[in-house]
Amino acid sequence: MTHSLLSKPGVKLHFGLNTHALLEAITQANDIVLHAAIYSNFADNAVGQLLLQRLQSVSFKQLTLLKLEPTSPWRDEFATILRPDMPLLEVERLYENSRHWCAELKRQFPEAVNLVSTQALPLQPILLIGDRLFVGHYAHSHTTSAQGLWIEFDVIALGLAPNSLIDWFYSGVTTEQDSPVVITLSRYVEECRRAVGDLWYQSVIALDKGRH
């Protein structure tokens, strides 16, 4: 039996990344996980500025940045997906800008920022912002993922407990949680968990025991 997510409260479709909704979610979140390949745009835009403000808040707990370091079999092809009209050398500069931005956040906030380099092939951009989840998609297109379709999930409006997403990220989803909503959302969280890697993840779980 299929279930229409669009008939449920807590699910919105956006034609292009809804920056206003994203900023609103960041303002309210104390735990954030970003799995978006590169973050060069954040270096000088409102999202990056707000993240910097949140990191300075005493209530903020953790920002996990999954930073892509692509491998050769798909590196060039993925570059054309990220920036279709940009030469490969220019895309590499974006990667370098992204590395610098991430490293600077880690330097300024060593306890609050988990910076993770991953070589896992990204399947979609995923922004886990507290109790809201923003998911886009990559495509072989002349437009970027930011201009494509995005889905916004509000887990509270969907009837899940507060902090469900971040709890799944740290601890996984139990097999008992098998509702259609949980199964759908957990796939995106599992994608982030897989990109993180087992060794790093075990250290995060150990650290998290002292925070919750």
Where are these regions (language model features)?
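Hydrophobic, Leu/Ile/Phe/Ala-enriched alpha-helical segments that form helix-helix packing faces
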Residues: 51-58, 98-109, 196
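HKD (HxKxxxxD) catalytic microenvironment of the phospholipase D
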Residues: 113-154
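PLD-like (HKD) phosphodiesterase/transphosphatidyltransferase domain
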Residues: 1-79, 166-171
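HKD-type phospholipase D/PLD-like phosphodiesterase module
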Residues: 70-124
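Cysteine/selenocysteine-centered motifs that mediate thiol-based redox chemistry or coordinate metal-sulfur cofactors
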Residues: 160-212
